[in-house]
């Protein structure tokens, strides 16, 4: 009986830890400065079209700074018309979003413009 109780406790604890880690890792939008919108135009140098959020590395046209841009979840991007092919390296885009409060080269995208087509991500 003690062994079953111990196993149940360990399984419960493992589930709780996994859930907490996933929750903390997923939505931390308060870490972005929503009071100061920022637009960055440039060329995508790398992209990841995966969950929980797609990402791109964007070399800014103005100054060459490389930004880590957090996009939307894949299902939302697909529903709104942003395909994986549209965010491949070499594509020129413009992103409107909010800069991370602590990471100077990271931003969360509200929308992205590709080939003069503006796509809302939030």
Regions found by a protein language model. Give the residues of each.
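Short boundary/loop segments of OB/S1/cold-shock single-stranded nucleic-acid-binding domains
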Residues: 23-38
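Conserved hydrophobic positions within beta-strands
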Residues: 42-44
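OB-fold/S1-family single-stranded nucleic acid-binding modules
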Residues: 100-122
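Short aromatic-glycine-enriched beta-strand elements
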Residues: 50-59
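Short nucleic-acid-contacting surface segments enriched for D/E, G, S/T with interspersed K/R
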Residues: 79-95
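Bacterial N-terminal signal peptides
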Residues: 10-20
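N-terminal secretory signal peptides that target proteins for export/translocation
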Residues: 1-6
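A short macromolecule-binding patch
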Residues: 63-73
